[in-house]
UniProtKB/Swiss-Prot annotation:
This is Large ribosomal subunit protein P2. The keyword Ligase does not apply. GO terms for cellular component: cytoplasm; cytosol; cytosolic large ribosomal subunit; postsynapse; presynapse; ribosome; synapse. It comes from Mus musculus. The modification N-acetylmethionine is found at M1.
Amino acid sequence: MRYVASYLLAALGGNSSPSAKDIKKILDSVGIEADDDRLNKVISELNGKNIEDVIAQGVGKLASVPAGGAVAVSAAPGSAAPAAGSAPAAAEEKKDEKKEESEESDDDMGFGLFD
């Protein structure tokens, strides 16, 4: 990803065909060593292509990928009715989870980056 980002940075900066040297210079400026094999792979895949077209194709491909969420789960026939003694224990666990969750939310100063 760092090689693609560096390539895009160079291309958006006006260099229509960044070389390995250009990308290494960008990576070195932030203290990242470049792996020549990966770097050459990225350059060979992107060289001569219009960056806007590549981004548009990528967005189209990402739009077709399902992004989690609704998974249908069916319970086994015998597990539909839980035992009567387990209900209070489940309620107690939920209280503990809410308590822990509120403590964690204080750590991120209310931003909820991964919520």
